[in-house]
Each structure stands twice: as structure tokens, then as C-alpha cells.
């Protein structure tokens, strides 16, 4: 066997292993939050970025082995940005044989008209985009709207709200729209951005950059993203631990009186879970909770079956 064949074989092995991990992450998120149910019609929002391409690919893959029936329709919003390659997504989706719809709305022109030069456009752009996608979901008869946000996006949102909004608020894996008509799901909620990036590179998706928001310097989200990436490099496992913390909230040890009845604690009350530990030194584990070295993780992947059950 030639050296090139050996490299190709190794690359394919690594790609299969990576895809299994992403399948497992997505399958677990779907099961944990009951994202997809029998007969669902999922509107997959496809921007042309690595995240949405990966989401569509993994959902298509799961669709073949899932114990329930659900359909997919890919939707792209053409916002009329200058230089947007209109042919890329239709050609890609037709090659896959995926049902799709391209929605054309000049939100770019509205944003440029309303937002002064130098100001960030993300807020208005996202509001306009959200309204159009909700309308499109109704027109298509979609029961769920799938967005491509991943674990890193969720953590970034948590820190953005803490640093700038004064709220302990993240980005939920599943939510009901404000009008109560649409359910939004984020199947990549458990997926790492670096895994998605590696998968997108290996699959050579035809990436379309966002020239409107991606080119804006000093965005608050970008500052947070850089901070988290730096933490991940310097303190391996910290990202995993922080995400685990979002899944293990103890309301009695925070300060929100809407979440816990502090006034109701009186003599004779039941013991609050872990309440008296406030006097003791915290026992901190030697390794971050929910984290294991890359090598161990890869070995575990080899032992797992390539089957993800969608409930």
C-alpha cells in the first residue's frame, strides 16, 4: 500500500470517528430535550456556514437510522448582500436531493439604511431574519425550526449576558417563539465548535462567508469567543466544566428570589440541599468535571456503537 493510500485510509478513519462523535452529540441532545418527534417536518435553516452545513449533514444521517419518521426541508434566506453567490446553495442541495426553499428578502438594504456606519448590525439583522424565518416555517408547514448554534455559542451567550446584560441567561437548546406558534431547536447544542470545524474542512462544504456581520471588528461576541478559546488552551477542560454547570443549576445557592423562596426559610423548615456547606471549604476535583483528555475520548469513541437513537 502506497503512502498516499495510507494517509487517505487514516483520514477516512478519523473522519468516520469524528462523524460518530457528532452523531452521538446530536442524538443525545435530541433525546434529552425531545427535539424531534414522530411526523415532524424540520425546517433546517441553512446560512452557508460550517455550522448549518454540519447540522444538515448529521440530521440527514440520523434520519436514515432513527426509529421515528421525520422530514427535512432546507431554507436559506438570501439577504441580498453584495457578492452573495446565489448559485452555491441550490446546486449543493440539488446534488444531495434535499428539498429546499430560497427566500429572497433585501434585509441587507434595510440594515444599511437604519444602522449608522461603524455600528454593529447584528441585533437588527437577527430580528429581521427571525421574523422572515417564522413566516416561512408557517408557509412550509414546518413543525420545528432547526438552528445551527453549538455548545460554544451557548457558552458565549451566557457570558455575554453576565458581562453586559446582568443576567444568568444562555441560549436554550429548545424554545417556544414569543407568539407561541413555533418551536425552535438547536440540535448541535452538545457539539464542540472545533469538531464542527474539522468536520466541515474534511467534507469540503462550499462555505459562504457573511460579509455583513463577520467583517465587523471588536464585536462583543467575538471578544467573549476569544476569551473562551484562550481559556480552553490554557486550562484544558474548563469549557466542558462550564457547560456542565449550565446543566447542574442549584437555585438555593444563587440570589434569585424568583427561583428560590429564601424568605420561606425559617426555623423548622426542611434542610436545603447542601445549605450548610456554605460554611465549609469547597472540595474541588483535581480534574474538571465532565472532561477527559483527547486521547481517552478517542479511545472511547472506538468502543461505542455507531447507532444513535432519536426519541
Curated annotation (Swiss-Prot):
Pathway: tRNA modification
Domain of life according to the entry: Bacteria
Cell location: Cytoplasm
GO CC field: cytoplasm
Pfam family, one: ATP_bind_3
Subunit-level organization: Homodimer.
Protein function: Catalyzes the ATP-dependent 2-thiolation of cytidine in position 32 of tRNA, to form 2-thiocytidine (s(2)C32). The sulfur atoms are provided by the cysteine/cysteine desulfurase (IscS) system.
Protein name in UniProt: tRNA-cytidine(32) 2-sulfurtransferase
